[in-house]
Amino acid sequence: VLMMADGLGLELDELTVESEVELATEDISIAAGLVPQGTVAAQRWEWCGVAYGRDVIRLEAIYKVHKSVAPQWQSPAWVCTIEGSPRLHFEADKWTTNGLVGTAMRAFHAIPAVVNAPAGVRTFLDLPLIAGANVVQQ
């Protein structure tokens, strides 16, 4: 959220963070092993960047060990919604495959920019990416 605000040329008044967990109601066997009953089987996180008295950037992340856990939370997916003019909305329902491919593509295509960058720690904002600076209206 902080890097998105920076890329938008936006100074946040506040950053809020909320989280909650769901426990396994029974033993769950997954590829990585056993998730015992009573242990954390899902997490929901939400970060909100507040400016001009309203949430201007909101990021929600839901992690589940199995799709049957925490049915009240949205199923794992990649969803991006930009409320603006025009409004943009994108959903990728094959969250594991698309998420892994999306992450790998981002890293793969960054190689030339990272190689050509000065030595040191860099963020996506330091590399030649397009950012919509100064587009959040008061």
Describe each PLM feature range.
Residues H66-Q138:
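C-terminal helical cap and adjacent loop that interface with cofactors, partners, or active-site loops
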Residues V1-A70, P76-W78, T97:
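Active-site-lining helix/loop region of Rossmann-like oxidoreductase modules
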